[in-house]
Amino acid sequence: MTDVSNIAPRDKAEILAQALPYIRKFHGKTMVIKYGGNAMTDPALQADFAEDVVLLKLVGINPVVVHGGGPQIEAALKRLGKKGEFIQGMRVTDAETMEIVEWVLGGEVQQDIVGLINQAGGKAVGLTGRDGGMIRAQKLKMRDNTDASKEYDVGQVGDIVSIDPSVVKALQDDAFIPVISPIGFGENNESYNINADVVAAKLATVLKAEKLMMLTNISGVLDKAGNLLTNLSARQIDDLFLDGTISGGMLPKISGALDAAKSGVNSVHIIDGRVPHVLLLEILTDQAFGTMIRSH
């Protein structure tokens, strides 16, 4: 991993010069960033992320942050003596777990992110999908990946019905940085826990984002031998689903990324959140990180 503080001044100047055409290219464009993994738990990486987001805003790019919080939810459940359960990468969410999820995501995790961005000189505003009627949802009907006739009950896990981006756009226009917790609401005002990767992908589509970037704890999508796959097409992804290469928590991430690519998001990247300042390196330099998802 590269520590930016150890880069020589001349090299830093070259990086800044390299960034100029990308700043011109992406000025006024929206970038949706799924923030999760080690980048959320390592203090140095947290600071790097906040600085990257603020700098993007300062140069005229509009970052929108959608955050996860799996480790924090697991820690809260453990403190309360409740065991987490997952089916095909989705957290089973009963009523009690839903209350914990809302408290952890909409409170603890979100406010930490907002505070870090504001401390770095930005103007972050925390939202959940309830705010401004942003994310309408319904109970997710989860079918088995290999047997479509088999259905799982995952409780208050939501499937997105619609996203109204008007509150996000209003914040962007006023120089704010939206930080969104992946919680939706149903027709009876019930809350739904929605996978953050799915929310980020759908929001990127609705906002007509230039890029969708998903930060992970690994270098990108790996084959069964552990080698990085730098580019993936829809057909290749189908093959990786079928042979089990993509499984667990990667399932909703890759499915969401592919849906966004098919729906017009210009580029979709799954990148290594363990790399310091990976957002700036991915967006504003010639360097490429992780896996790029293509619709064809």
From Swiss-Prot:
Pathway: Amino-acid biosynthesis; L-arginine biosynthesis; N(2)-acetyl-L-ornithine from L-glutamate: step 2/4
UniProt cross-references to Pfam families, sorted A to Z: AA_kinase (PF00696)
Reaction(s) catalysed (UniProt annotation): N-acetyl-L-glutamate + ATP = N-acetyl-L-glutamyl 5-phosphate + ADP
Compartmental location: Cytoplasm
Leading EC class: transferase
Keywords, sorted A to Z: Amino-acid biosynthesis, Arginine biosynthesis, ATP-binding, Cytoplasm, Kinase, Nucleotide-binding, Transferase
Record GO terms (molecular function): acetylglutamate kinase activity; ATP binding
Major location category of this protein: cytoplasm
EC number: 2.7.2.8
Residue sites binding substrate per the record: 69-70, 91, 193
InterPro entries per UniProt: AceGlu_kinase-like_sf (IPR036393), AcgluKinase_fam (IPR004662), ArgB (IPR037528), Asp/Glu/Uridylate_kinase (IPR001048), Glu/AcGlu_kinase (IPR001057), NAGK-C (IPR041727)
Gene3D superfamilies (alphabetical): Acetylglutamate kinase-like
Residues of the site described as Transition state stabilizer: 34, 253
A cellular component term, taken from the record's GO annotations: cytoplasm
Entry's Gene Ontology BP terms: arginine biosynthetic process via ornithine; L-arginine biosynthetic process
Family annotation (NCBIfam families): argB
Function: Catalyzes the ATP-dependent phosphorylation of N-acetyl-L-glutamate.
Protein family: Belongs to the acetylglutamate kinase family. ArgB subfamily.
This protein's name: Acetylglutamate kinase
The organism of origin for this protein: Albidiferax ferrireducens (strain ATCC BAA-621 / DSM 15236 / T118) (Rhodoferax ferrireducens)
Upper lineage: Bacteria, Pseudomonadati, Pseudomonadota, Betaproteobacteria, Burkholderiales
